[in-house]
Amino acid sequence: IMLDGEDITYQKEHVRSKVIGHLFQDPLKGTAPHMTIEENMALAYLRTTTSKNAYFSRIKAADKKKFREQLALLDMGLEDRMKQPVGLLSGGQRQALTLLMATMVTPKILLLDEHTAALDPATAEKVLNLTKKIVSEQNITCLMVTHNMHQALELGNRTLMMDSGNIVLDVSGEEREKMSVDDLLEQFAVRAGKALDNDRILFSKVEA
C-alpha cells in the first residue's frame, strides 16, 4: 500500500494514524466514552507529536480555546459541553466529533467507512454536509465507502465499484458527470456479469 510515495503496508498502526484519518460505520468506535469531549480532542490533536509523554501532558488554555472554536463549527452546542463524557452524546454527535478529531491535524488521506449508515436520515445528512465542508476546505484526499448509489455519483470526482474484492468499474470525468444511478447499475451488471441484489443498494436507488 503506497501513500504519497511511501510504502505503509507494514507500518504499525500508531505510525499510520499520524497521516490517516478514519471514521467507522459504528459512531461509538471513534471516541473514548469515559473521557470528556475535551480529552478526546486533546488525544486527537496530539497524535502527530513525537513526544512519548504528549498524550499525558496538561491541556493548555490555548488548546481549549481552539477546541471550543472548532466544536462551535459543528453547530451542535458541544462547545458548551467540553467537560462532559463523550458517552453521554448521541450517535450523531459522536460521529460529528469523530470527524472533527480525524481532521484536526489535516491527514494525507481520510477514510470513511459508511460513516453515516447507522444514523437517522436527518443526522446522516448533517454529518455528510459537515464532511463535504471539511474535506473541501482542507483539500483532503478522501476515500468513502458507501452503499448509497446517489452518494457514489454525487460526491467526490471518481466512483469505483467492487465485487468479491475486485474493482469492476472505475468512472470519472465527463462520463461520471453524465451517469445516472440506472446507468451505474447497468455498467456494474455488464462488468461483473451479474446484477446487484443488495437490498440497501436497491433501496438507495429509489431514494431522492
Please place each PLM-identified region on the residue numbering.
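ABC ATPase NBD Q-loop/coupling interface
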Residues: I1-R16, R58, G173-E175
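Q-loop/switch helix immediately C-terminal to the Walker
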Residues: M35-T49
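ABC ATPase C-loop
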Residues: A102-T103
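Catalytic Walker B motif of ABC-type/P-loop ATPase nucleotide-binding domains
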Residues: L110-D113
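Helix N-cap at the start of a conserved alpha-helix in ABC-type nucleotide-binding domains
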Residues: P121-T123
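Helical segment within the ABC ATPase nucleotide-binding domain
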Residues: E125-Q138
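H-loop/switch region of ABC-family ATPase nucleotide-binding domains
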Residues: T146-H147
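ABC ATPase nucleotide-binding domains
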Residues: E177-A208
